[in-house]
């Protein structure tokens, strides 16, 4: 078993290193701060990838925590549903597991001009323009937010992120930061991220997130009904209704204030 694990890690590490080296070389001519930013992204991504454990091997381990076993098996069912019913092939994603031993995988920094409600966007290769800047370290995120506030007078917000998609660049693992979510939330998230791998329009974060959320939430209801897990659907639907109501309130407030 040890030799199998070593071989798996060796193959995956070489694959990941080739891609990460490409990304680093892509930004080698960038400024120091930009290079530092992408450097922490590459380092954080590599740390996650090297910690991956194959789900199939974990499920064969008799000492595996029963709760984790149930959640991993559930995600396999969700993947099968996404592939057969929605045509969203995982392409190797969510077939490995990583225990991060922290609450969030990333921390996003959102910034806006003082008294404005439109976020400052940053444009990046591959992802396009998005209204946030991600860090694998909470301290780095807070430091960047502080600098933006002190040096540019921007309003800032730092929020933890439980999951993200590498948009097909890497085979995204299941993370401990979301493994304990409820049935519908978990199904919505997995399908949401799989859709990002299939459809991502550079520079249109609102469309990308809106589409993935709609498909993920709708498919989660269908999956739970098909697998006899629909007893909590009403709770899930109610939480989505409350979120839509809040968003509508914000839109109306912006119109009223003419901002």
Report each predicted region and the residues it spans.
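Bacterial N-terminal signal peptides that target proteins for export
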Residues: 6-21
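Bacterial N-terminal signal peptides
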Residues: 20-30
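Bacterial Sec signal peptide processing site at the extreme N-terminus
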Residues: 31-53
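Acidic/histidine-rich, surface-exposed loop or edge segments in extracytoplasmic proteins
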Residues: 49-64, 122-130, 198
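Post-signal-peptide N-terminal segment of Sec-exported extracytoplasmic proteins
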Residues: 54-84
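Acidic/His-rich structured neighborhood in mature extracellular/periplasmic domains
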Residues: 78-243
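C-terminal amphipathic alpha-helical segment
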Residues: 236-259
